[in-house]
Amino acid sequence: MLKLDLKERDSLDLRCIAGHHGLANPITISDLNRPGLVLSGFFDFVAYRRIQLFGRGEHAYLLALLEQGRYGAIEKMFTFDLPCCIFSHGITPPEKFLHLAEPSSCPILVTRLTSSELSLRLMRVLSNIFAPTIALHGVLVEVYGVGILISGDSGVGKSETALELIERGHRLVADDLVEISCVNGNSLIGRGVHKSIGHHMEIRGLGIINITQLYGVGSIRERKEVQMVVQLEEWNSSKAYDRLGTQELNTTILDVSVPLIEIPVRPGRNIPIILETAAMNERLKRMGYFSAKEFNQSVLKLMEQNAAHAPYYRPDDTY
C-alpha cells in the first residue's frame, strides 16, 4: 500500500485486522477523509480515493447503525474502491463491520494513536511520498547546519570541495545526483537517489570511496533541507563578480526560491573555507543581520560625517 521505511512504520503503529489481500491497494492522494457523512447516508460527494479515518465519533455512530440493523450505508460505502480504513485510539471495529468489508478488498487497520496524532503523522508521511520531485547533478552537504547544494560543470571540483568539508567535520547527504522534493509547498528536502550507494563519492584519480567507512556515521545524513545553492565556475576574467555581497542572487527549484552564490574557481582559492563562511553568513542573514548591507551603511554614514565637517571653501581659493 505505502512504501514506508522502518521509522515511518513505527511512528504510525498500524496493524491490519482484516482485508489483508487488499494491502496492495494504491493510494493516489495525500488527503484524509472522515466518513461521517457517508455513514449517515449522504453519497452525493464521496472522497473514496482518500484514506478513511474512523475516530471515536465515527465508531460510536457505526455501533448505533449496527445495533439498529441499518447496514445499507455501510454496504454502499464499500462499493467504492476505498484504499483502506483506519481506526484510531486502538478501537477494534465490530465483527459485523469486518464481515461487510471483507468482499470489498478494503484493508481495515487499527492504531493506538489518537485521531489528531494519526492525522498529523499520516499527512507528514503522505506529503513526503506525493511531493513533487526532481533530480539534480551536484553534491549536497550540511555545513554548520545549513544545507548547501554544490553545483557546477563536470570537473570543476564539486566532489573535492565536499570531501574537504567532510574532512573538516561537516556532513555529506548525497554526491553526484541529488533527489530534491518540495514538501509543504516551500521546503526543499534533498537526499540521495539510491540509499545503498548514496554516501559514496567519486574522486578523479582516486575512484569510488565510501564516506561512511572512512569517516564514520557522524559524517553523513540521510536527508537535509536545501537552503543555499553554490555554483562553482571557472574563473572568467571578463566577468564582473560581486565583491561587496550586496547583490542577492536567487535560483528556483520546483518553484521555490533559494539563495544562490556564484564562486569562481582558480588555483590558490580555498573553496571549502569560502563555503564555510557562506554558510555562517547565511545563518546570520536568517537571524536578521546582513554583513554587506551593514558595511555599506557604515561607509555611507562615514562619508556623510566627513562631508559635514569639510570646509565650504579652501583658504587658497581665488576669485
Curated annotation (Swiss-Prot):
Reaction catalysis annotation: [HPr protein]-L-serine + ATP = [HPr protein]-O-phospho-L-serine + ADP + H(+); [HPr protein]-O-phospho-L-serine + phosphate + H(+) = [HPr protein]-L-serine + diphosphate
Amino acids binding Mg(2+): 159, 202
Any GO BP: regulation of carbohydrate metabolic process
Keyword ATP-binding in record: yes
Positions with a binding annotation for ATP: 152-159
Extra facts: Both phosphorylation and phosphorolysis are carried out by the same active site and suggest a common mechanism for both reactions.
Subunit structure of this chain's protein: Homohexamer.
Entry comment, domain topic: The Walker A ATP-binding motif also binds Pi and PPi.
Name of this protein: HPr kinase/phosphorylase
